[in-house]
Curated annotation (Swiss-Prot):
Superkingdom assignment: Bacteria
Origin species: Mycobacterium tuberculosis (strain CDC 1551 / Oshkosh)
Pathway entry: Phospholipid metabolism; phosphatidylinositol metabolism
GO BP annotations listed: glycerophospholipid biosynthetic process; glycolipid biosynthetic process; phosphatidylinositol metabolic process
Binding-site residues, substrate: 16, 207, 211-212, 283-287, 291
Family affiliation: Belongs to the glycosyltransferase group 1 family.
Official protein name in the record: GDP-mannose-dependent alpha-(1-6)-phosphatidylinositol dimannoside mannosyltransferase
UniProt keyword annotations, A-Z: Glycosyltransferase, Lipid biosynthesis, Lipid metabolism, Phospholipid biosynthesis, Phospholipid metabolism, Transferase, Virulence
Single GO molecular function: heteroglycan alpha-mannosyltransferase activity
Site, as annotated: Important for catalytic activity: 283
Broad EC category: transferase
Disulphide bonds in the chain: none
Classification via InterPro entries: Glyco_trans_1, Glyco_trans_4-like_N, Glycosyltransferase_grp1
Enzyme Commission number(s) from the entry: 2.4.1.-
Amino acid sequence: MRVVQVANFYGPRSGGLRTAVDRLGAEYCASGHEVFLIVPGARTERHLLRTGVVRITLPAKHIPYTGGYRAVMPGAVRTVLETLRPDALEVSDRLTLRSLGRWGREHGVTTVMISHERLDRFAGQLLPRRAAQKFADFANARTAANYDTVVCTTGFAREEFDRIGATNTVTVPLGVDLKTFHPRRRCARVRQHWATPTQILLVHCGRLSVEKHADRSIDALAALCDAGVDARLVIAGEGPLRARLERKATGLPIDFTGFISDRHAVAGLLASADVALAPGPHETFGLAALESLACGTPAVVSRTSALTEIITADSGACADNRPEAIAHAVRTIVSRPERHRRRCARRRAEIFTWQRAAASMLATLGAMAVSTRCGDTQDTA
């Protein structure tokens, strides 16, 4: 099967979306399928990736106030699709590229839209709640009508489609790289670099943008300090809010690393921490938190996000969107025996593999056969 993936908001620092698209494409290739990926960039380029995916970059303009993201328009993508003649089309953009579903239908191509975010929650950051929901319902109804299937990564992500009565949704949880993100990445030197032996080391890993709410991690650290807890926070990531967050963190034991391109270095930081913080209230999956679990580090997550479907009572904690609640959850986690909490975190992450996610996606895309590797085999090395 020839699969074409299309993704806007895909770049060197685009985090979870890029990870998901790349890993799914790699697994499709490993299952014997031909995969092309169309993304925006500064110029036209074509590269054969080590995974076997052919990545085609189309020139696109920067989107203001997004920290460097670009978006390619549907017309340019349709021109490439005409030459590629795919069997299946997988789109990861519900706004600028939604019209590609109609192109697929007109050309007899199986079409899938992956819902990487809650559109009603996203719009709710700019519009009153009722207006945001009305906008999301209209856009989501068009998406559901234009695509054969809408893939949601969690029940939380699916809620806004359930609300409009869409009947062509499926739920496919994403995965985690269990080799890269592993408890063996824990490193005494890394921990010593960031914290003293007696400190509680917290880490917030993610893009420094409004929806991630890194400010809540800062406030939670302040609440811990006010309560007499010796804790330190490392914020790993880059984004448009960095300067504002650094000002907010003044005087607190908080370090900013900026963007870390080396995934092994990210894994080393996560594995060396005591607790990871993922306070974003709108997360539809939360790959960074899952990567933390894979490293054996429990996570505190927002009670209003999809991460409540990922985190279990023994692999972390769900907290209300208040600094005091997050701080209390941290103290509860670190009160448990370290060996037990780390083992439970890792065990929970092992359920989520890219092989399993890709098997479900290929079934949705209409593959007639799925390789054994993309089936029940779990990579728990």
